[in-house]
Amino acid sequence: MKNLSENANVDTKTMPAADVHLTLTKAVKYQFGNLMLILRDDNGNSVQVTLKSTELKPGEYSKDQMSSAYVTISGGGSYRNLDSDDPGSFTVKYDEGTGIYIIEGVLILQPNASYPSVNVVRFEYVGAI
């Protein structure tokens, strides 16, 4: 293995610790005054976020930009609300040339006695919306 400085085309970044990592494969958005974004996979996992905006723009979304959100995790609880003090955040990137979004983040769930080991969810989505 070469020294890190000798490796070309390698990006490294520190990822926050998470209890669950979801690679979501489907996305839809709805406009009901505010924007609702739903990301899900074929295993019943999903992230649903209602934003305090009418458009999904590139940038970071945290407590101030989210009006409500919940996460459903197969084997980890349905409709798990986010922590009201620190719900976590996610980042949206968009490539206008390809129409592809990259959405990734870490959400912190309210504690749940039925699922005490699932409190932090890291997720990512790459695709069109």
Regions found by a protein language model. Give the residues of each.
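An extracellular/secretory-lumen and virion-surface interaction module
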Residues: 1-129
